[in-house]
From Swiss-Prot:
Organ and tissue specificity: Expressed by the venom gland.
Native source organism of the sequence: Lychas mucronatus (Chinese swimming scorpion)
A Pfam family recorded for this sequence: Scorpion_toxin_alpha-beta
InterPro entries reported for this sequence: Long_scorpion_toxin_alpha/beta
Segments crossing the lipid bilayer: none
Keyword annotations from UniProtKB, A to Z: Disulfide bond, Ion channel impairing toxin, Neurotoxin, Potassium channel impairing toxin, Secreted, Signal, Toxin
Protein name from the UniProt record: Neurotoxin beta-KTx 52.1
A GO molecular function held by the record: toxin activity
Position of the signal peptide: 1-20
Amino acid sequence: MKQYIFFLALIVLTATFAEAGKKTEILDKVKKVFSKAKDKVLAGVEDLNNMSELGCPFIDKWCEDHCDSKKLVGKCENFDCSCVKLGGK
């Protein structure tokens, strides 16, 4: 979410430079920076997806152990651990 706000702020700054009549060289440099940043973010998302496939069993086990210590049942979904009380007691 913070990344989207950052990119939105940079877009607003870019539009401000364009409205102020700055040279296109500045805009071209900013566009190149945005392009590189976008590529890095997309590469990071790809890496995170690859790591999540490997990390899920460890996180699931941690979640189960964490909730078991509270005498609850653990459910891990999208890296979010939820402890649920089963039964009527």
